[in-house]
Amino acid sequence: MSGNTFGHLFTVTSFGESHGPAIGCVVDGCPPGLAICEADIQRELDRRKPGTSRHVTQRREPDTVEILSGVFEGKTTGTPIALLIRNQDQRSKDYGNIADTFRPGHADYTYWHKYGIRDPRGGGRSSARETAVRVAAGAIAKKWLSERFGIVVRGHLTQIGDIDIPFTSWDLVDTNPFFAADTSRLDELEAYMDSIRKSCDSIGARLRVVAENVPVGWGEPVFDRLDADIAYAMMGINAVKGVEIGAGFGCVTQRGSEHGDELTPEGFVSNHAGGILGGISTGQHIEVSMAIKPTSSIARPRRSIDRQGQPVNMETHGRHDPCVGIRATPIAEAMLALVLIDHALRHRAQCGDVRVETPQIAGRVG
């Protein structure tokens, strides 16, 4: 299976399946000398791990990370960093009834036609379980970006179903199970998710992730544009079906006089571009939004076919997130950080000595 490596200079190669002994990744290209320990990575993993509330899968995985290589006396050595997370709460018997059928909305049908073999236990390689190692790798990227450039990458949920979640403060995001930046609608969200779960159904979500203090100049024009790589990274997250940069699809109703971000000596007047112009960072906040589809695994009878192409009615049992978007925020943060560190290293390699007389203006006026 190809397509398991992400990045150019800072690369992440992941491995493992949902119900295998372990999942893990190898991070290559990390600059030497970065102080990193398992606790730094564990903090990010704990934000994503399952079983943290009744609104997510009840699979109980501690997601304890082990650093196997690439770190000596608490610092990265510049050699490959191997990270391992052991699976401890698999319940493969829940998937015995789907070995010869294809779950609607899942990768079962496509994996079977592509490879001629598939692991039905928890979705195997296509499971969102794999994203834990992306969060682990992203923790390393986040720490380097923060220490080297003061970059902060953070996200929050903006919508579940038809419930919009306004933004009030970043300080609120990690105080509730929904990664919400406003707590005024928590009771409504709790009741809504309870009703979704009791009806044996699932629901979609929307989230936003922001990178602050990104310098101007990162990104490669044409094919490796910064926004193109960000969209590529986000679309590689399970269940993501749409990505917007800045105003995104909202630009359809904007006029050029409104959408174009004017520049003044004091700074940009707006940020409809989402911090990227011509595929290169502007120095403003990079703002990304994404739409996440409803969980495909639901305990409702649905039509499908078996391997022989015969019609079947099937229900998907097991432990599943009624809204996969709830736990997607740390994953999206990690993927944005991985894109940024890769472009930081690429920029340093080609254009690190470039200096111009024009000062970098503020990200936004007011």
From Swiss-Prot:
It is an enzyme of class 4 (lyase). Pathway: Metabolic intermediate biosynthesis; chorismate biosynthesis; chorismate from D-erythrose 4-phosphate and phosphoenolpyruvate: step 7/7. Its EC number is 4.2.3.5. PROSITE patterns: CHORISMATE_SYNTHASE_1, CHORISMATE_SYNTHASE_2, CHORISMATE_SYNTHASE_3. GO terms for cellular component: cytosol. GO terms for biological process: amino acid biosynthetic process; aromatic amino acid family biosynthetic process; chorismate biosynthetic process. InterPro entries: Chorismate_synth (IPR000453), Chorismate_synth_AroC_sf (IPR035904), Chorismate_synthase_CS (IPR020541). Gene3D superfamilies: Chorismate synthase AroC. Its cofactor is FMNH2. Reduced FMN (FMNH(2)). FMN binds at R125, S126, S127, N238, A239, G278, K293, P294, T295, S296, S297, R319. NADP(+) binds at R48, R54. It comes from the Bacteria. Keywords: Amino-acid biosynthesis, Aromatic amino acid biosynthesis, FAD, Flavoprotein, FMN, Lyase, NADP. It catalyses: 5-O-(1-carboxyvinyl)-3-phosphoshikimate = chorismate + phosphate. This reaction introduces a second double bond into the aromatic ring system. Belongs to the chorismate synthase family. This is Chorismate synthase. It comes from Laribacter hongkongensis (strain HLHK9).
